[in-house]
Amino acid sequence: MTVFDASALLAFLSAEEGTDIVESALESGGMCSTANWSEVAQKVLAAGGDWDLSRALLLSYGISLEPVDADDAEWAAHRWRAGEGLSLGDRLCLALAHRTDDEVLTADHTWG
């Protein structure tokens, strides 16, 4: 299963380059942490988008929303490094992937 970073879902919703890759992964099933889900909602709303429509579209693919648990939060905290590019949301996405032993799909080029 695929763990979706907020950037991948936002790229899909915005029809950016790589949308076909994200859609294919969505069709195969996947999950998103509730922290990243909040980030997607915030960015859609801040851009003046229709969150209800975006939410319905993403959920129509059967994406699973996974809560952040204490172990995820602590795993993410241990990976914080001053001056490095991974945000809390990024680290919580990686924590979910670590917990579930799944691959992450991101559109964030700073991940390398």
Segments from the language model and where they lie:
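Short, well-structured N-terminal submotif of metal-dependent ribonuclease cores
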Residues: 1-32, 44-56
